């Protein structure tokens, strides 16, 4: 794919290639389906992953192309193992909302996650 995607590519061209995405019953699938539909294109996943962290290994095995958060792919992009495909259409910004129950104590993992999310939000 490295030679095919040196220049920005349209979503219309992108759907000609095998596509890896989360399953149809996920908000991520709905998010990208809407993104493609806003540009008049029907998105279909050739391969569905159960979790977001399964997409990158599938891409690395040349099973197709997929959307994942940039921080998850940054290292392998920098190493030249995979490429970031430049798009003509600007992907929509995706936001998350952090909610918590302040009436009960949080686990250490929950506190670490909360801290990571807030640090990531401060960078933007």
Regions found by a protein language model. Give the residues of each.
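Short amphipathic alpha-helical segments
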Residues: 15-18, 43, 94-97
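Hydrophobic hinge/microswitch elements
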Residues: 31-85
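Secondary-structure junction motif
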Residues: 3-5, 18-39, 106-108, 114, ...
């Amino acid at each position: 794919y490295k030679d095919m995607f040196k220049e920005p590519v349209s979503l219309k061209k992108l759907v000609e290639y095998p596509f890896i995405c989360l399953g149809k019953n996920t908000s991520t699938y709905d998010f990208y389906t809407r993104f493609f539909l806003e540009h008049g294109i029907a998105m279909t996943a050739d391969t569905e992953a159960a979790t977001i962290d399964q997409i990158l290994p599938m891409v690395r095995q040349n099973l197709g192309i997929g959307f994942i958060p940039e921080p998850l792919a940054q290292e392998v992009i920098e190493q030249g193992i995979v490429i970031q495909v430049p798009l003509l259409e600007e992907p929509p910004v995706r936001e998350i909302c952090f909610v918590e129950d302040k009436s009960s104590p949080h686990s250490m993992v929950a506190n670490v996650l909360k801290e990571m999310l807030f640090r990531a939000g401060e960078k933007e």
